[in-house]
């Protein structure tokens, strides 16, 4: 299925504006872990076609901006970044490309509004990137068509690109079949397509062979995975891969959290005691307008079953504040839920109306869809975040004096320290050198300090 926009041929570049030797690509990634994984795939793909990775945009011959459209602010960040890269294009003759969800949603507007963008492409077109780069030397265009589900080919990771890194993302699926009223993802990522489980397991095995210890399975809604087995079964298969010590995944929809998945947390120690389970609101009325397909009580039932199956599990969540029609009582419900659940962390944002979504189309059409004044929404968000900071600080303080396992990910920004994470995904600054805590090692650490968002410790 093709969705192609082509503009007039480009004028020839001035002599000497782009070197003939091996070129460099700089990737600026916005948004989610799926985007981070896509960026890795794009760098690997271009690496097979004589592109090296540029550490700064000033050294790049191709600048790729991999975008997020979940909130309007992300689009504003894109336009700001494009303005900064315009000078690099003028000086080096660099190509500028926009990929990801904003590219999928706003292809025509981007090409018209930003004349120095050379090409635009959606998430389903990553595999064509080398051909698109060559074509962009001749003309400006957008390629944002969807691949049919049966024809979709997941980009293959190059395990060598992960050598020396202890962690890696592994794509399990893409797209989303839910129709949450606030969410643009089904319009920018398409329908759900699951990757066949043997392919996922094989990639995890190849990553383990080059030293990866932890894999994170990613998708817009991994709980609905259907690649030849259930998601719970997939986790058990990955856990059987020699060399893989830790398994994480994201993101999940509470409606699809099965008893079988809860059982995996109970039975499989390689599946880390950390679960991101977005709730969005503590009000049944707001959840219904959001089309989330669960009530607060149903969410808490799943939450409690996870806690019972894996005592000590760190559960994180998302909140949207200021959704249309949210009253003070609705917001108080979110605060009450936060206090009841004691989430390890929550990612909370103001409601951002997105094109084509139900919430955007219904905004202002009825009393229950009235827009919340920004000042009211901002004040509520500040209250929610203050409560979350207090709860998170208490959770970190409770770790003082404990001996925990830390996967060392590399050097810290502070001299004489290494950086790693606990099974619960808590960041630990470890007072050790490379010899005492090499990258990829699982070390025991005694926690000596709890900060606002991280821990400090010494080898135990």
Curated annotation (Swiss-Prot):
Question: SMART domains under this entry?
Answer: Elp3 (SM00729)
Which of the seven top EC classes does this enzyme belong to?
transferase
Residue ranges occupied by any TRAM domain in the UniProt entry: 397-460
Instruction: Give start and end of each Radical SAM core domain.
Output: 162-394
Quote the cellular component terms of the Gene Ontology held in the record. cytosol
Q: Which UniProt keywords apply?
A: 4Fe-4S, Cytoplasm, Iron, Iron-sulfur, Metal-binding, S-adenosyl-L-methionine, Transferase, tRNA processing
Q: Which cofactor does it need?
A: [4Fe-4S] cluster
Tell me which stretches of the chain form a coiled coil. Answer: none
Q: What InterPro entries has UniProt attached to this entry? A: Elp3/MiaA/NifB-like_rSAM (IPR006638), Methylthiotransferase (IPR005839), Methylthiotransferase_N (IPR013848), Methylthiotransferase_N_sf (IPR038135), MiaB_methiolase (IPR006463), rSAM (IPR007197), rSAM_horseshoe (IPR023404), TRAM_dom (IPR002792)
Domain MTTase N-terminal, by residue range, is 23-138
Q: Which residues bind [4Fe-4S] cluster 1?
A: 32, 68, 101
Q: Where in the cell is it found?
A: Cytoplasm
The reply to whether 4Fe-4S figures as a keyword in the UniProt entry is yes
Q: How is the cofactor bound?
A: Binds 2 [4Fe-4S] clusters. One cluster is coordinated with 3 cysteines and an exchangeable S-adenosyl-L-methionine.
EC number per UniProt = 2.8.4.3
Which positions are annotated as binding [4Fe-4S] cluster 2? 176, 180, 183
Checking Pfam families in the record gives:
Radical_SAM (PF04055), TRAM (PF01938), UPF0004 (PF00919)
Q: Which GO terms describe its molecular function?
A: 4 iron, 4 sulfur cluster binding; metal ion binding; N6-isopentenyladenosine methylthiotransferase activity
Which reaction is this enzyme known to catalyze? N(6)-dimethylallyladenosine(37) in tRNA + (sulfur carrier)-SH + AH2 + 2 S-adenosyl-L-methionine = 2-methylsulfanyl-N(6)-dimethylallyladenosine(37) in tRNA + (sulfur carrier)-H + 5'-deoxyadenosine + L-methionine + A + S-adenosyl-L-homocysteine + 2 H(+)
Cite the record's note on assembly: Monomer.
Q: What is the role of the protein in this entry? A: Catalyzes the methylthiolation of N6-(dimethylallyl)adenosine (i(6)A), leading to the formation of 2-methylthio-N6-(dimethylallyl)adenosine (ms(2)i(6)A) at position 37 in tRNAs that read codons beginning with uridine.
Per the record, the similarity remark reads: Belongs to the methylthiotransferase family. MiaB subfamily.
Name of the protein in question: tRNA-2-methylthio-N(6)-dimethylallyladenosine synthase
């Amino acid at each position: 299925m093709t969705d192609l926009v082509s503009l007039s041929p480009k004028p020839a570049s001035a002599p000497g504006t782009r070197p003939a030797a091996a070129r460099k690509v700089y990737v600026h990634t916005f948004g989610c872990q799926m985007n981070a994984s896509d960026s890795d795939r794009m760098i690997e793909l271009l690496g097979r076609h004589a592109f090296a990775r540029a550490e700064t945009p000033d050294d790049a011959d191709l600048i790729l901006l991999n975008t997020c459209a979940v909130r309007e602010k992300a689009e504003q960040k894109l336009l700001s970044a494009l303005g900064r890269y315009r000078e690099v294009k003028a000086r080096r003759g660099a190509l500028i490309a926009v990929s990801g969800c904003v590219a999928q949603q706003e292809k025509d507007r981007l090409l018209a509004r930003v004349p120095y963008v050379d090409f635009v492409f959606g998430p389903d077109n990553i595999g064509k990137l080398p051909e698109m780069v060559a074509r962009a030397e001749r003309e400006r265009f957008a390629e944002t068509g969807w691949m049919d589900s049966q024809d979709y080919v997941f980009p293959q990771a190059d395990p060598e690109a992960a050598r020396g890194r202890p962690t890696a993302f592994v794509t399990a699926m893409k797209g989303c079949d839910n129709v949450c009223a606030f969410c643009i993802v089904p319009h920018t990522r398409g329908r759900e397509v699951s990757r066949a489980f043997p392919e996922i397991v094989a990639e995890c095995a190849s990553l383990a062979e080059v030293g990866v210890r932890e894999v994170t399975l990613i998708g817009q809604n991994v709980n609905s995975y259907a690649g030849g087995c259930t998601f719970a079964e997939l986790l058990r298969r990955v856990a059987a891969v020699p060399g893989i010590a830790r398994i994480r995944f994201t993101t999940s929809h509470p409606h699809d959290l099965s008893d079988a998945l809860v059982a995996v947390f109970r039975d499989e120690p390689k599946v880390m005691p950390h679960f991101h389970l977005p709730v969005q609101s503590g009000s049944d009325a707001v959840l219904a307008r959001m089309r989330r397909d669960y009530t607060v009580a149903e969410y808490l039932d799943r939450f409690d079953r996870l806690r019972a199956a894996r005592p000590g599990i760190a559960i994180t969540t998302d909140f949207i504040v200021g959704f249309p029609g949210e009253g003070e009582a609705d917001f108080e419900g979110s605060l009450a839920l936060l206090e009841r659940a004691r989430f390890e962390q929550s990612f909370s944002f103001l409601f951002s109306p997105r094109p084509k979504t139900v919430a955007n189309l219904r905004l202002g059409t009825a009393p229950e869809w009235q827009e919340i004044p920004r000042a009211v929404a901002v004040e509520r968000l500040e209250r929610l975040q203050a409560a979350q900071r207090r709860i998170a600080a208490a959770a970190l303080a409770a770790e003082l004096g404990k001996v925990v396992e830390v996967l060392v990910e590399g050097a810290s920004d502070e001299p004489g320290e290494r950086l790693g994470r606990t099974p619960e995904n808590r960041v630990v600054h470890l007072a050790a050198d490379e010899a005492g805590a090499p990258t990829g090692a699982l070390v025991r650490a005694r926690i000596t300090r709890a900060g606002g968002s991280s821990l400090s410790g010494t080898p135990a």
